[in-house]
């Protein structure tokens, strides 16, 4: 088998939900190592790609995190409130543009020098979202608002 040969074929999709984002069921054939094609089906949730940033202060040795309510976590037995880095969906912006805006919206800090760290898929077994991770140094002078966004 050639490295560039297709390993997936005959993809069919069925829309299951588009209430908030898109949930689809895909049926496809996957080429196995023994050369046989095997039909499989999977559901995939598509909510778009996102970006995450960890703000740090080297001098104070601190980071800025936000506290947000996450309903899916709540229905899994947790109180629903998570401590996390500022993040948001790209919504047609570049990862760099979006994360600068999200950092200010959620934390109140306006950062200008962001550094990409890595990209990763959130939960690749069922979600299409790719996350772009960044870091940025902040100081007290970078504070332009209370932040908050949707954070509680």
Model region roles, listed by residue range:
Residues 27-34, 123-144:
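Active-site-adjacent beta-strand/loop module that shapes the phosphate/pyrophosphate-binding cleft
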Residues 15-19, 74-76, 120-132:
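Acidic pyrophosphate-coordinating catalytic loop
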Residues 15-60, 74:
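Acidic, metal-coordinating catalytic segment for phosphate/diphosphate chemistry
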Residues 92-97, 106-113:
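Beta-rich strand-turn-strand
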Residues 42-45, 54, 59-101, 118, ...:
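Conserved Nudix-box catalytic region and its N-terminal flanking loop in Nudix hydrolases
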Residues 8-9, 110-117:
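A short coil-to-beta-strand element that immediately follows conserved catalytic motifs
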Residues 1-14:
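A short, amphipathic edge element
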Residues 112, 151-152:
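Phosphate-/nucleic-acid-contacting segments
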């Amino acid at each position: 088998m050639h490295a560039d040969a297709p390993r997936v074929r005959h993809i069919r999709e069925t829309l299951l939900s588009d209430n908030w984002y898109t949930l689809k069921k895909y049926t496809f054939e996957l080429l196995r190592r023994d050369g046989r094609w095997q039909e499989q089906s999977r559901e995939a949730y598509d909510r778009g790609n996102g970006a995450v940033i960890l703000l740090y202060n080297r001098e104070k040795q601190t980071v800025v995190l936000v506290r947000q309510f996450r309903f899916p976590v709540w229905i899994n037995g947790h109180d629903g409130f998570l401590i996390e880095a500022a993040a948001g969906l790209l919504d047609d912006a570049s990862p760099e543009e979006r994360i600068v805006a999200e950092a200010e919206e959620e934390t109140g800090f306006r950062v200008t020098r962001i550094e990409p760290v890595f990209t990763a898929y959130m939960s690749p077994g069922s979600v299409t979202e790719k996350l772009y991770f960044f870091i940025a140094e902040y100081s007290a002078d970078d504070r332009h608002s209370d932040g908050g966004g949707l954070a509680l």
